């Protein structure tokens, strides 16, 4: 059980970085890899972070960074399509990476905020 305590401590000490890493980890459950146990681990870690968040603002930030990691890594195929004409469209790759994760991260942030409001005692 020593590794479990270390994992909980790591998640609690770096909540935003942990949420970003868990969001990137959850992408492994998508095609072509289908590693579904990693999705369970990612959502379990997200729930731990949300229940440990001291305020709704922190829960919103944790949800946002989870969504940023999930969508920025999960929508890599858009960046891959931009690489077909790299000299002309290459400048769009960082904007697409940050923009897709930044915008779609809000779709995970608001449910995380509501989860914080409705958590039990």
Model-assigned labels for residue ranges:
Residues 2-121:
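Membrane-embedded alpha-helical bundles of multi-pass enzymes
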């Amino acid at each position: 059980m020593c590794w479990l305590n270390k994992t909980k401590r790591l998640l609690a000490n770096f909540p935003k970085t942990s949420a970003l890493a868990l969001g990137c980890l959850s992408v492994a459950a998508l095609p072509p890899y289908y590693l579904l146990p990693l999705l369970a681990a990612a959502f379990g870690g997200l729930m731990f972070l949300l229940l440990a968040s001291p305020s709704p603002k922190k829960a919103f930030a944790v949800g946002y960074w989870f969504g940023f990691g999930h969508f920025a890594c999960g929508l890599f195929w858009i960046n891959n399509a931009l690489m077909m004409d790299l000299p002309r469209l290459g400048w769009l790759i960082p904007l697409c990476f940050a923009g897709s994760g930044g915008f779609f991260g809000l779709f995970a942030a608001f449910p995380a905020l509501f989860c914080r409001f409705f958590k039990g005692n």
